[in-house]
């Protein structure tokens, strides 16, 4: 480490600390009102739908109305013609204090997810639904704005981080959890864009601009949008697929290259553009991969890959057994950074979750922190 820090000291543009690339949940929560307050401020009713339950209540107000079925739910819009009409007037409760949620225009949200995504639709006709769906009544433009947010990655990501029960005890969000998500107050310009985008998606099903719009509404930085995507791609996929998750997939050369590109971009922003160590990956047959940064050699612009060295394979296999720990049938595999005289070695399992964008950000920040500590 001393030789490395002497090399690092040559860079004039170094600064004292690196900004941690994390999704600032506290800032998000303090910047915008919760959905609950947002709805209250705009005079919008919200509640879960009716419950059949014990059927002790007879109510004729829903006779002949279309019923939205959670099992046949579609995002953004559902034509009235595809729904069955209600012919049963017995209930346990009918959300009597919030009957406007069944009147058009209204937003209906499915509280359970489909492959990590939540769905909401805005309907321009009266319809009823049961307590597995959440209804919101209010001004139509606001409903379409909220519909875009609920259908977006940001909505799923927020609840992935904050929900007490989703993917732990149950597959659905509780209404109370849904109401905690921060909602930015839209300007007239944002509302116009939201309506335009909603109508575009409703008409042709093209959702390619959805997440970019919502990222912009929440003023997320580029790296935050990547963190959101990584979390849903890897964390949710792990909950869903378990051992078959892409999180455990062997990284491709492209994955390693993308990791290295992000990793070096962050380090150069911290240490200066003159920080150009020679870099190489060892990706043989062992369960571990190694990124080697040779501080004393300048990068010739090429990222090298090696995959066949018997002594290295033997060493990595032994190291893997030392880094793998079993506790109560849970396997823990540790990551290692080794600081040699002239080189830095980053040793991690050969699984995609350790070589994605989020990992590159975290590794670069931790490496920078180690260097700063060594500098004193």
Predicted regions and their residues:
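Basic, amphipathic alpha-helical recognition segments used for DNA target recognition
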Residues: 134-180, 187-190, 351-376
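Short, charged/polar micro-motifs that form catalytic or ligand-binding hotspots
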Residues: 95-99, 136-140, 168-171, 180, ...
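Short amphipathic alpha-helical patches
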Residues: 91, 132, 136, 169-181, ...
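Non-catalytic DNA-recognition/assembly elements of restriction-modification systems
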Residues: 2-51, 63, 68-73, 184-376
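Polyanion-binding catalytic cores of nucleic-acid enzymes and NTP/SAM-utilizing transferases
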Residues: 1-135, 139
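Hydrophobic, well-ordered secondary-structure elements that form the walls
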Residues: 109, 152, 181, 218
């Amino acid at each position: 480490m001393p030789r490395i820090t002497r090399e690092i000291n040559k860079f004039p543009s170094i600064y004292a600390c690196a900004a941690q690339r994390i999704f600032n949940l506290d800032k998000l929560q303090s910047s915008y009102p919760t959905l609950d307050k947002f709805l209250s401020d705009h005079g919008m009713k919200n509640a879960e739908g009716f419950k059949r339950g014990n059927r002790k209540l007879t109510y004729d107000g829903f006779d002949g109305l279309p019923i939205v079925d959670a099992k046949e739910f579609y995002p953004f819009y559902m034509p009235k013609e595809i729904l069955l009409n209600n012919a049963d007037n017995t209930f346990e409760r009918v959300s009597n204090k919030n009957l406007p949620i069944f009147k058009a225009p209204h937003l209906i949200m499915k509280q359970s997810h489909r492959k990590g995504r939540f769905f909401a639709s805005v309907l321009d006709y009266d319809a009823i639904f049961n307590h597995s769906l959440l209804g919101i009544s209010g001004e139509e433009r606001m409903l379409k704005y909220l519909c875009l947010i609920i259908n977006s990655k940001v909505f799923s990501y927020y609840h992935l981080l904050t929900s007490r029960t989703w993917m732990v005890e149950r597959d659905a969000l509780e209404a109370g959890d849904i109401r905690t998500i921060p909602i930015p107050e839209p300007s007239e310009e944002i509302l116009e864009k939201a309506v335009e985008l909603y109508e575009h998606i409703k008409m042709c099903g093209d959702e390619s601009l959805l997440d970019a719009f919502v990222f912009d509404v929440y003023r997320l930085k580029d790296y935050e949008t990547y963190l959101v995507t990584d979390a849903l791609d890897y964390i949710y996929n792990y909950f869903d697929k378990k051992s078959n998750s892409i999180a455990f997939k062997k990284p491709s050369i492209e994955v390693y290259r993308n990791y290295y590109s992000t990793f070096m971009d962050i380090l150069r922003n911290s240490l200066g553009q003159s920080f150009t160590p020679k870099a190489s990956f060892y990706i043989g047959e062992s369960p571990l991969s190694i990124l080697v940064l040779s501080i004393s050699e300048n990068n010739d612009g090429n990222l090298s890959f090696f995959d066949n060295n018997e002594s290295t394979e033997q060493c990595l296999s032994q190291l893997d057994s030392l880094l793998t720990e079993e506790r109560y049938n849970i396997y823990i595999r540790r990551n290692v950074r080794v600081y040699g005289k002239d080189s830095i070695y980053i040793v991690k399992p050969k699984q995609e979750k350790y070589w994605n964008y989020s990992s590159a950000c975290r590794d670069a920040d931790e490496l920078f922190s180690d260097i700063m500590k060594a500098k004193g």
